């Protein structure tokens, strides 16, 4: 009877996988022996595998470029990275190696762009898509970029009042965009996005303001779907509505030539993850082209804003199991050497699921456990509804957890886990 942890994983999922394989009962992540990393640096530890960032960027580029070629689509594709997903210098350095553009969300992001330009990592003709609600400092920083010769700064109007603020702050010619207030998913708490301008107001607003102002050119129409790019009736309906608005606006605004399809690709958060990126990309391009052809409008350049997709599959967080506690005959707790609330807040705040795997002891029998954090807060545990809050891990023995009473425990005697 196969009751080992490695048997459970290999029989439940297709395993090994692209990112994961096991040698000598220890987990390798993208070819990296995680136990060697733990022995050198200890836990808790977060690592980033930078090549995965470039790999995902190049994959998305390839999918869109192939889809554009197959559909005989006349527009271009532009990949934008959302800085809010990770501001770390080493992440931005890796991202910008791929010649991508930047999407910003705050005044702070503008300061980062200026530093990146000073370091020779960002060109002044790269696109800078300025999203988010804009406080005055953000407005002023955008205006400073324009006056400093950044030629493709595109502030996206999230409300009508921002137009007057930008008009006062910016003195030089500038491209501009409008965000559509998309309808939210039916099960969401609200009907319409809090950001953006309503469908029915966009054309009247353009004609009464931007059209009359020679300083601004309406370059881009932007919509954002909270659920991301998914094969659902809701997503395709919102895409269709937004492209139709684009066509109506293009007929009276010749400068308009770009559609920003906000909301990113999903990322791999479970070993059974299955998503057809190529199909979705081809469908997006095909549907935009079909609607534009029907309306007699030239296809727009396509911009995407990928944050989580860019960096979400490139990180691992490694923990030690400090102690095991049995509270009753059904609940067995493995206590990690950190806090989920501070280290992985998405796991408890929005029930974000992660791939959880043992780093060592794959030859041991497995058991069902709950993962708990160090703090006294009752919510400090791995709280993924998709996993029913419990995971399976190699059985803990008396010598493979570490406590204050066992300061000299060797690494091979301690159970380590990774969240990816």
Model-found features: residue ranges?
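Active-site beta-loop-alpha junctions enriched in small/polar residues
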Residues: 52, 80-88, 105-109, 133-135, ...
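Solvent-exposed alpha-helices and their adjacent loops that cap or buttress functional pockets
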Residues: 121-122, 147-149, 169-171, 187, ...
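Active-site loop/helix belt of alpha/beta enzymes
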Residues: 1-10, 169-173, 182-330
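Charged (often Lys/Glu-rich) extended helix/loop segments that serve as interaction or gating elements
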Residues: 293, 297-420
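Structured core elements
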Residues: 101-103, 129, 154-156, 177-179, ...
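General structural feature for long, well-ordered alpha-helical segments within catalytic domains
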Residues: 33, 49-52, 56, 60, ...
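Short helix/loop capping segments that flank catalytic or ligand/cofactor-binding pockets
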Residues: 89-91, 112-113, 165-166, 269, ...
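A charged N-terminal "starter" segment
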Residues: 1-174, 178, 207, 211-217, ...
């Amino acid at each position: 009877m196969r009751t080992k942890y490695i048997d459970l994983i290999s029989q439940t999922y297709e395993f090994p996988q692209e990112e994961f394989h096991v040698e000598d009962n220890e987990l390798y992540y993208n070819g990296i022996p995680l136990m060697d990393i733990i022995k050198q640096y200890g836990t808790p530890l977060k690592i980033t595998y930078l090549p995965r960032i470039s790999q995902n960027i190049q994959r998305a580029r390839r999918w869109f470029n192939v889809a554009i070629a197959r559909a005989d689509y006349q527009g271009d594709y532009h990949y934008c990275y959302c800085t809010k997903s990770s501001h770390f210098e080493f992440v931005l350095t890796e991202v910008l190696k791929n010649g991508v553009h930047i999407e910003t969300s705050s005044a702070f992001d503008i300061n980062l762009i200026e530093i990146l330009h000073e370091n020779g990592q960002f060109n002044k003709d790269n696109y800078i898509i300025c999203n988010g609600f804009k406080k005055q400092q953000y407005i002023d920083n955008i205006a400073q970029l324009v006056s400093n010769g950044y030629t493709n700064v595109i502030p996206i109007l999230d409300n009508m009042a921002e137009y007057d603020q930008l008009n006062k702050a910016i003195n030089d010619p500038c491209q501009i965009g409008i965000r559509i207030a998309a309808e939210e998913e039916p099960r969401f708490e609200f009907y319409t996005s809090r950001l953006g301008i309503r469908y029915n107001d966009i054309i009247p607003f353009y004609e009464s303001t931007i059209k009359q102002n020679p300083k601004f050119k309406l370059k881009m129409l932007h919509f954002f779907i909270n659920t991301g790019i998914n094969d659902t009736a809701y997503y395709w309906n919102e895409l269709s509505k937004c492209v139709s608005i684009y066509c109506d606006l293009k007929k009276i605004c010749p400068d308009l030539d770009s559609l920003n399809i906000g909301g990113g690709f999903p990322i791999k958060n479970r070993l059974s993850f299955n998503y057809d990126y190529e199909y979705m990309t081809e469908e997006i391009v095909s549907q935009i082209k079909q609607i534009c052809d029907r309306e007699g409008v030239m296809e727009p350049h396509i911009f995407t804003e990928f944050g989580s997709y860019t960096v979400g599959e490139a990180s691992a967080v490694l923990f030690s199991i400090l102690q095991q506690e049995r509270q009753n005959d059904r609940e067995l707790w493995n206590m990690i050497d950190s806090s989920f609330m501070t280290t992985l807040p998405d796991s408890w705040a929005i029930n974000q699921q992660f791939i959880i795997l043992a780093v060592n002891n794959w030859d041991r029998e497995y058991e069902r456990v709950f993962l708990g954090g160090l703090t006294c807060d009752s919510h400090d545990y791995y709280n993924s509804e998709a996993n029913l809050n419990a995971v399976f891990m190699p059985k803990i023995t008396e010598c493979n957890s570490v406590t204050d009473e066992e300061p000299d425990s060797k690494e091979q005697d301690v159970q380590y886990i990774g969240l990816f």
